[in-house]
Design a protein with these regions (language model features):
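Short, membrane-interfacial amphipathic segments enriched in basic
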Residues: 1-29, 207, 212
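Start (N-cap) of specific transmembrane helices in multi-pass transporter permeases
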Residues: 115, 127-147, 221, 225
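Short cytoplasmic-facing helical segments at TM-TM junctions of multi-pass membrane proteins
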Residues: 108-133, 215-218
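Loop-to-helix entry region at the N-terminal start of transmembrane alpha-helices
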Residues: 45, 72-104, 138-147, 180-196
Length: 249
């Protein structure tokens, strides 16, 4: 019954967030702060991962395409679609679940254990709206931007690896990028990014907000939040792919 009670408390938490703010200016400052923490705080790791994802994709694709009947520009097509459809949204969001998700869970957990949340509630502040909603809205704004950046850097990293290792020329790689391009793939990746960003922010917020105990329980809640977020991301990835990709229907 624990899982059903957790789902119920999670839904009640989401419902409790949507109330009229007591001080809109205070909420705006918290929203900007969360945008800085989630967006710019994760920019470095996202950039590094994206470049190497594209580079590894290019090298491994070239290793497998050994048939002389397949034009070299196909490498660019495969890297483009792989990065846009799967690597950029899914892998980057799994990393962000560990980076941003653990921070959200530990921050709220520390506030709960130190009774800061109780103090805010005594002051008449809706802590769900003030502490959780800005994190979710900031994630919905910043994480899709990070995913879009990851797409561009992943494709650029693949081009860099292709030219540096002599697999194929830059013009051949660019030709492959333009061949059989499906714009819906980008839209699909951004849809996944929005769904994943809600999971990354709301699930750790739930585990951090309702933590009980001391420092040990905060660590356990952060770990559980990251694990559950990653599982939900992979499950949502499959569901969205089965529902939205034309070939899967």
């Amino acid at each position: 019954m624990t899982i059903f009670s957790d789902i119920g408390r999670y839904l009640l938490m989401i419902k409790g967030m949507f109330s009229r703010p007591e001080n809109a200016k205070m909420y705006w400052k918290e929203f900007i702060h969360q945008c800085t923490e989630i967006g710019f705080g994760s920019l470095g790791i996202v950039a590094i991962i994206s470049v190497f994802i594209g580079a590894v994709s290019t090298v491994q694709t070239a290793y497998q395409l050994v048939s002389p009947l397949i034009p070299p520009s196909t490498i660019g097509q495969i890297v483009r679609d792989t990065v846009i459809l799967e690597f950029a949204p899914t892998l980057v969001c799994i990393v962000l679940a560990g980076v941003a998700g653990s921070r959200i869970a530990s921050e709220l957990g520390n506030m709960r254990v130190s009774e800061q949340i109780d103090a805010l509630e005594i002051m008449g502040i809706n802590t769900k709206t003030y502490l959780i909603l800005p994190k979710i809205v900031a994630s919905l704004l910043m994480i899709p931007m990070l995913v879009a950046l990851a797409m561009a850097l992943g494709i650029w990293g693949g081009r860099l690896a292709a030219t540096a290792s002599g697999i194929l020329s830059g013009s051949t790689y660019d030709k492959g990028l333009l061949e059989f391009f499906v714009p819906f793939n980008v839209i699909f990746a951004l849809i996944k990014a929005y769904v994943f960003s809600f999971i990354i922010s709301s699930v750790p917020a739930f585990y951090g907000y309702y933590v009980k105990g001391g420092a040990l329980e905060i660590g356990r809640a952060s770990t559980k939040a990251v694990v559950v977020s990653c599982i939900l991301i992979l499950f949502a990835d499959y569901v969205l792919s089965a529902l939205l990709l034309p070939s899967a229907q």
